[in-house]
Amino acid sequence: MAAKEVKFSTDARDRMLKGVNILADAVKVTLGPKGRNVVIEKSFGAPRITKDGVSVAKEIELADKFENMGAQMVKEVASRTNDEAGDGTTTATVLAQAIVREGMKAVAAGMNPMDLKRGIDLATTTVVEAIKAAARPVKDSDEVAQVGTISANGEAQIGRFIADASQKVGNEGVITVEENKGMDTEVEVVEGMQFDRGYLSPYFVTNPDKMIADLEDAYILLHEKKLSSLQPMVPLLEAVIQSTRPLIIVAEDVEGEALATLVVNKLRGGLKIAAVKAPGFGDRRKAMLQDIAILTGGQVISDDLGMKLENVTLDMLGRAKKVTISKENTTIVDGHGDKAEINARVAHIRTQIEETTSDYDREKLQERVAKLAGGVAVIRVGGMTEVEVKERKDRVDDALNATRAAVQEGIIVGGGVALVQAAKKLNDLTGANSDQDAGISIVRRALEAPLRQIAENAGVDGAVVAGKVRESADPAFGFNAQTEEYGDMFGFGVIDPAKVTRTALEDAASIAGLLITTECMIAEKPEPKAAPAGGMGGMGGMDMM
């Protein structure tokens, strides 16, 4: 086992604080509408340029192991805030640095670290309640756009795109962000249910120009297993031909003779037909087939339920006004499903969302809700270069998460003003002893740090700005760093989601409390490396050619 290096008390805390400062100083330059970029070297390709706090934090690893421990703890603040709220990572980092810095000074002055932490926790709880009380619901798409704009470092176009996408898909909808190959950023809304499976043969195409199969007023057969032979389906196919409607087969797979027969019938014009694979895998495939069945008013033909293809009749098939199938995707528009059954299915999936502990499962379940009840919007982010596209995509992701958070818990004044106003609630708060009071004072001072940093990044004296905002009796009065004006922040459209600000403070105080109460640090001692072997001796008596 390798030898360990152990550091205690002041020595340990000083090294840890140095690491905290290095990481926080790198992250906080990105804060606010006039925040600067951070350029990150990549092992291959162009460097990455970003204004996303958590992306910067994740890249930082320090050579000194004790300093690195401090940096990693603050990195945890950014990661936790990003996981919970999806934005506010820079604010959380700035708050954590401010609390740790003040807390370390208090510990060095001889105060009890445990009482300091109790005071910090007490103050944090009070401020969180004040933030929740100050929050108000999002009224309209303009406010959604404002939240998105602020989170995207002041780019109004991004805020507008997100507001448009939210309006089109509704509260149940899902918005995803992708990179666009062109220069323009655009929003594409998919109506109905879309899943990522395309036609099994290009011979099913009805529109050769676009290479898609467009089938209107179609029947949909949902089969859980593979189809290798069409013999059991002959009675059903004859009924479909008599109805003169198209048929879409959605099955685990359609192969061999079955696929060949379908293609021949399609080419001869006897049958308007297309076949696609069922979406998903395993249990998720079964669930998604059931979703399609409920949306289209059909049934899933399953051996588990004792159903046989020979016995399938037209009334067991799903129906849809239009089905569009491309090489990669299938979209079902206006399914004939019963509204009450669709709502019951959505409620059932929502219950699963609440119960699941897996983020991946939660995301997939939310997508299923969106496909049944709302819609799916895709924001395709464009730019002149790949580096620019990636930088903008980071900001669109942040803005999207911020708008979701705003819808969940409401909005408060932005620009760091809400924290400064909430700090006034701490004026009358007292702890059980003087050390706890010191912990409360630490939080009171730290709450001004984000506002100061936003001002300083805009080239203005942070202390002067914080003083003016603190003295104002108007809770909405603040400093708009974009225009460098003082006034009503709601009027300026500078608003933040309450959830983001609350989460940032809670996570910062939690990790800062742990750092302040650290008394000992243990790290592996670097092993001395052996000196490299000497070079080969000269070879005397040989003439050089």
Curated annotation (Swiss-Prot):
Organism's domain of life?
Bacteria
* InterPro entries noted in UniProt: Chaperonin_Cpn60_CS, Cpn60/GroEL, Cpn60/GroEL/TCP-1, GroEL-like_apical_dom_sf, GROEL-like_equatorial_sf, TCP-1-like_intermed_sf
* Pfam families assigned to the protein according to its UniProt record, in alphabetical order: Cpn60_TCP1 (PF00118)
Mind telling me which Gene3D superfamilies this protein's record contains?
GroEL (3.50.7.10), GroEL-like equatorial domain (1.10.560.10), TCP-1-like chaperonin intermediate domain (3.30.260.10)
One cellular-component annotation, GO: cytoplasm
The principal localisation class reads cytoplasm
Keyword Cytoplasm set for record: yes
Keywords of the record, alphabetical order, are: ATP-binding, Chaperone, Cytoplasm, Isomerase, Nucleotide-binding
Catalysed reaction per UniProt? Answer: ATP + H2O + a folded polypeptide = ADP + phosphate + an unfolded polypeptide
A GO BP term here is: protein refolding
Coiled-coil blocks: none
One GO molecular function term of this record is: ATP-dependent protein folding chaperone
Q: Tell me the compartments it is located in.
A: Cytoplasm
Does this UniProt record's set of keywords contain Lyase?
Answer: no
Q: What is its EC number?
A: 5.6.1.7
User: Where does this protein hold ATP?
Assistant: T30, L31, G32, P33, K51, D87, G88, T89, T90, T91, G415, D496
Q: What does this protein do?
A: Together with its co-chaperonin GroES, plays an essential role in assisting protein folding. The GroEL-GroES system forms a nano-cage that allows encapsulation of the non-native substrate proteins and provides a physical environment optimized to promote and accelerate protein folding.
> Quaternary state and partners of this protein?
Forms a cylinder of 14 subunits composed of two heptameric rings stacked back-to-back. Interacts with the co-chaperonin GroES.
State the family named in the UniProt similarity comment for this chain.
Belongs to the chaperonin (HSP60) family.
Query: How is this protein named in the record?
Result: Chaperonin GroEL
- This chain's source organism reads Rhodobacter capsulatus
Name the gene that codes for it. Answer: groEL
